[in-house]
């Protein structure tokens, strides 16, 4: 995933209202009105959030004039989740090694460089 | 991510900030440290190379933002990519809390530094893996495009 795309995705997700909108869309399409309902903010404010999500490719909007249903686009989210998972594994394994290293040092076994004898 | 290590805080902090010690554990299973150059102080930079089991070298580099022994370490990191440029820059914050003879280490990593600066979030915006991953898991657990990843 390109750094820019990742940036855009995370920036879009950095707002709790937008995260809640995405969570709602996970259960199916909705209109702007339906999405605005749970929040104490104006329709134009919700529309602004939807624009950010749309630009990030996280939602797509239908074209019918009156009714422009919003739906979730899972691609960028999936990529973000994979990125997170990749790093979680990376650090998890590093910390396993750190744990092992700390044990060795305290038993007086390891050298500082961790070289095998 | 949080881990509890059976070691005193000073040692755990040293494991992160003494270059020879870092070389002993940094990186996924099977990786070895090939080269490292670390200037561990606020504003200092580092470069670090690790080699995968199949012989591919990965360089990373960054800047230390805070080095507060033995409780807090903050640094950026980015992978050096093909043409010598840098990939996504990330900010890592590690804190160390003593729990008796043990140490509770809390680790946060986020790609949000650039975003935080741009959007002017005063204190910066970092995210723990767990909070974000939890959000994804709970929000989308019923969605066909699940974000679960098999171990």
Predicted regions and their residues:
Chain B
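Glycine-rich portal/gate segments that line the openings of hydrophobic small-molecule binding cavities
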Residues: 34-76
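A short, structured loop/turn motif at beta-sheet edges
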Residues: 9-10, 40-41, 65-72, 95-104
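Hydrophobic ligand-binding cavity/cleft-lining segments
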Residues: 1-32, 151
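A structural signal for short, well-ordered beta-strand segments
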Residues: 1-3, 64, 94, 107
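Beta-strand/loop substructures that line and gate deep hydrophobic ligand-binding cavities in soluble
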Residues: 74-127
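A conserved amphipathic terminal alpha-helix motif
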Residues: 111-151
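Hydrophobic pocket/interface hotspot
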Residues: 12, 22, 46-48, 64, ...
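Hydrophobic core residues within well-ordered beta-strands of beta-rich domains
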Residues: 1, 58-60, 90-92
């Amino acid at each position: 995933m390109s750094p820019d795309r990742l940036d855009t995705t995370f920036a879009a997700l950095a707002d709790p209202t937008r995260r809640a909108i995405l969570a709602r869309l996970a259960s199916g399409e909705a209109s702007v009105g339906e999405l605005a309902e749970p929040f104490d903010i104006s329709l134009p404010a919700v529309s602004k959030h939807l624009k950010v999500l749309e630009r990030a490719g996280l939602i797509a909007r239908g074209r019918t004039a009156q009714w422009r249903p919003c739906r979730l686009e899972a691609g960028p989210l999936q990529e973000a989740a994979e990125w997170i998972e990749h790093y979680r594994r990376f650090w998890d394994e590093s910390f396993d090694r750190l744990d092992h290293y700390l044990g060795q040092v305290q038993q007086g076994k390891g050298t500082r460089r961790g070289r095998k004898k | 991510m949080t881990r509890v290590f059976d070691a005193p805080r000073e040692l755990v902090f040293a494991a992160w900030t003494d270059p020879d010690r870092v070389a002993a554990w940094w990186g996924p299973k099977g990786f070895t440290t090939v080269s490292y150059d670390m200037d561990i102080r606020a504003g200092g930079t580092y470069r670090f190379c690790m080699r995968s089991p199949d012989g591919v070298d990965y360089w990373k580099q960054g800047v230390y933002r805070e080095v507060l022994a033995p409780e807090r370490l903050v640094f950026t990191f980015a992978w050096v990519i093909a043409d010598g440029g840098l990939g996504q820059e990330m900010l890592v914050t590690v804190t160390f809390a003593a729990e008796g003879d043990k140490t509770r280490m809390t680790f946060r990593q986020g790609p949000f530094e650039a975003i935080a600066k741009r959007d002017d979030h005063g204190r910066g915006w970092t995210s723990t893996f767990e909070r974000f991953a939890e959000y994804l898991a709970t929000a989308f657990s019923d969605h066909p495009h699940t974000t679960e990843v098999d171990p």
